[in-house]
């Protein structure tokens, strides 16, 4: 062991006999494993300085979506001590119509009860897809999930798994999108369709279809068609004064227009941009 850096802490805050200080060694960047030692306080935990210090944390954060997969067996080969048998494989009943049941398995659990909802999932998926678009070089095909090694970035494989659940939540006849799957004491309810969920669905599926077309054009087109059907159903039942729905509608129209170039979606973009209130990021 050898001393590689010496310095003195600077007082940040002082209240009575208590002092809060910090040490700044930002100008020291040599890779390695170190600890800090100070009189009275002793040694700190060891820490690393490296250009790749966050790599393992980033990989594990991305893999949390795999651990949260619903409706499939997670083997120990990929899940380790988080392995479990397939869950929530039974039918869910439609809230308000107990005689109607449907398969709502799949996707990602969003809480400890295994519940799932379209808008919450859309927010998560959109952040992941935006990150992938901006920094594609950071996403590999070797993150340790069953799809690893298929020549498709694993983050897109993971999002595709979630889109499979999205497609289950869309009514094949009307294009309506059920809002989610909520647990109760005897099973789970499928929540009724609503415009907000449909616009969120449309935005997410269009964006994924756009990104995925170079890997699987047929599935990408399936997603894009589903987005178009959801949007068209949503505009029939949206509430005129619902601000959040307007934001989702704008985002959905933008993504469908980007992916498919359909001129009919321009009017929704122009309408929103002409409204004067361009607040978006804080609501999405």
For each predicted feature, which ranges?
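Ligand-binding face of N-terminal immunoglobulin V-set domains in extracellular IgSF glycoproteins
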Residues: 1-52
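Aromatic- and glycine-enriched glycan-recognition loops and surfaces
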Residues: 23-26, 108-119, 145-165, 172, ...
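An acidic-aromatic substrate-binding cleft motif
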Residues: 41-119, 123
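Long, well-ordered core segments of solenoidal/helical folds
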Residues: 52-74, 155-174, 223-240, 258-283
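Carbohydrate-binding/catalytic loop surfaces
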Residues: 82-111, 175-192, 241-256
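A conserved hydrophobic secondary-structure block that centers on an alpha-helix together
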Residues: 149, 153, 173, 181-237
């Amino acid at each position: 062991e050898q001393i590689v850096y010496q310095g003195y802490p600077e007082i940040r805050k002082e209240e009575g006999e208590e002092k809060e200080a910090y040490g700044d060694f930002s100008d020291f960047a040599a890779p390695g494993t170190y600890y800090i030692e100070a009189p009275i306080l002793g040694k700190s935990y060891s820490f690393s300085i490296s250009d790749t210090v966050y790599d393992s944390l980033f990989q594990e954060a991305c893999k949390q979506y795999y651990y949260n997969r619903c409706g499939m067996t997670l083997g120990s080969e990929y899940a380790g001590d988080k392995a479990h048998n397939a869950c929530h494989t039974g039918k869910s009943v439609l809230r308000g119509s107990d005689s109607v049941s449907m398969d709502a398995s799949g996707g990602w659990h969003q809480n400890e009860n295994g519940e799932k909802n379209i808008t919450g999932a859309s927010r998560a998926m959109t952040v992941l897809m935006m990150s992938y678009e901006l920094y594609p070089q950071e996403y590999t095909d070797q993150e340790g999930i069953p799809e690893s090694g298929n020549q498709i970035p694993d983050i897109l494989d993971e999002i595709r798994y979630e889109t499979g659940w999205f497609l289950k939540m869309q009514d094949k006849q009307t294009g309506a999108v059920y809002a989610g799957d909520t647990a109760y004491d005897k099973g789970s309810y499928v929540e009724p369709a609503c415009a907000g969920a449909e616009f969120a669905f449309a935005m997410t599926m269009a964006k994924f279809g756009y990104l995925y077309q170079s890997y699987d054009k047929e599935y990408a087109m399936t997603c894009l068609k589903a987005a178009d059907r959801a949007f068209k159903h949503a505009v029939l039942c949206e509430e005129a004064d619902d601000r959040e729905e307007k934001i989702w509608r704008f985002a959905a129209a933008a993504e469908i227009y980007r992916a498919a170039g359909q001129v009919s979606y321009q009017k929704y973009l122009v309408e929103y941009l002409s409204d004067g209130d361009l607040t978006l990021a804080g609501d999405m």
